[in-house]
């Protein structure tokens, strides 16, 4: 007989760390005006840590992630209420410059999406568009970003090669480098390794672990092993609600709620 859960139960961690990179207060996302996809989520993300958002398909984790840098603004009929607090400002207000928000809170998507340009131009063109003309400065930006994404040694002799010829893992790390090149403080990753082979997945995880020294990372993943290996904190979503949020070690070994324990152990999903 199927287990019945009390979905009204919640266990939400209040991070002990004083430095909070980002937080939401009563965040709600609506589609088509009235369909509520995210139900009043309040949570905080500690600085320089990796937080994994987990939950079954349709749980709202990707919708919540996209709200954090206002990507849902691009969806017709989408509406977001509540607060998204970053550096003392509620960035979910109309007066906020959304393009500046997305520079500070970058996004890496599920499938690698390099532009149909050279490896070099995938990074350089953003800065050229923003007025950087000095070739030495562009070279420095490209090299630094590729090194941060652990890709420089593999591509430094082929920077004029089309990015479309790269392997999936390399292309995804190029997308990470591109996001890093504008010097964000937070990186959002929506299942960044789901389309990759195991070796590329491991490389992405290693890159994330290195990046958290300088960045705060929030990742959506369906891969429980990945969440347990690569994250410091884990948040379990179900049907648009945040059910449990705690240290990853606690979520995977001593969760407070039966629903969380059953999900991470594969009993449903």
Swiss-Prot record:
Disulfide bonds: none
Subcellular localization(s) per the UniProt record: Cell membrane
Domain (ABC transporter) ranges: 22-264
Catalytic reaction annotation: phosphate(out) + ATP + H2O = ADP + 2 phosphate(in) + H(+)
GO CC annotation: plasma membrane
Catalytic activity, EC: 7.3.2.1
UniProt GO MF annotations: ATP binding; ATP hydrolysis activity; ATPase-coupled phosphate ion transmembrane transporter activity
Biological processes, Gene Ontology terms: phosphate ion transmembrane transport
Entry membrane topology: Peripheral membrane protein
EC class name: translocase
Alphabetical UniProt keywords: ATP-binding, Cell membrane, Membrane, Nucleotide-binding, Phosphate transport, Translocase, Transport
Sequence positions that bind ATP: 55-62
Function: Part of the ABC transporter complex PstSACB involved in phosphate import. Responsible for energy coupling to the transport system.
Subunit structure: The complex is composed of two ATP-binding proteins (PstB), two transmembrane proteins (PstC and PstA) and a solute-binding protein (PstS).
Alphabetical list of PANTHER family matching this protein: ABC TRANSPORTER I FAMILY MEMBER 17, PHOSPHATE IMPORT ATP-BINDING PROTEIN PSTB 2
Protein family: Belongs to the ABC transporter superfamily. Phosphate importer (TC 3.A.1.7) family.
Name this polypeptide is given: Phosphate import ATP-binding protein PstB 2
Gene this chain is encoded by: pstB2
């Amino acid at each position: 007989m199927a287990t019945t859960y009390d979905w009204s139960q919640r266990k939400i961690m209040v991070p002990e760390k004083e430095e909070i990179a980002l937080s939401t207060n009563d965040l709600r996302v609506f589609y088509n005006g009235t369909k509520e996809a995210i139900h009043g989520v309040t949570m905080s993300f500690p600085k320089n840590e990796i937080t994994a958002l987990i939950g079954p398909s349709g749980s709202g984790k990707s919708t919540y992630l996209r709200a954090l840098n206002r990507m849902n603004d691009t969806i017709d009929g989408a509406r977001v209420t509540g607060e998204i607090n970053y550096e003392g400002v509620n960035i979910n207000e109309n007066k906020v410059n959304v393009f500046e928000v997305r520079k500070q809170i970058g996004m890496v998507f599920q499938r690698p999406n390099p532009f149909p340009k050279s490896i070099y131009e995938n990074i350089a063109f953003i800065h050229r568009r923003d007025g950087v003309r000095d070739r030495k400065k562009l070279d420095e930006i490209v090299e630094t970003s590729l090194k941060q994404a652990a890709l420089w040694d593999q591509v430094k002799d082929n920077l004029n090669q089309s990015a479309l010829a790269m392997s999936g893992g390399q292309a995804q790390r190029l997308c990470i480098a591109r996001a890093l090149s504008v010097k964000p403080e937070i990186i959002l990753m929506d299942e960044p390794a789901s389309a990759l082979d195991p070796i590329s997945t491991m490389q992405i995880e290693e890159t994330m672990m290195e990046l958290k020294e300088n960045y705060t990372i929030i990742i959506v993943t369906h891969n429980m092993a990945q969440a347990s290996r690569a994250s410091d904190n884990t948040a379990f979503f179900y049907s648009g609600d945040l059910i449990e949020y705690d240290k990853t070690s606690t979520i995977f070994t001593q969760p407070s709620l039966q629903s969380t324990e059953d999900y991470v152990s594969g009993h449903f999903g």
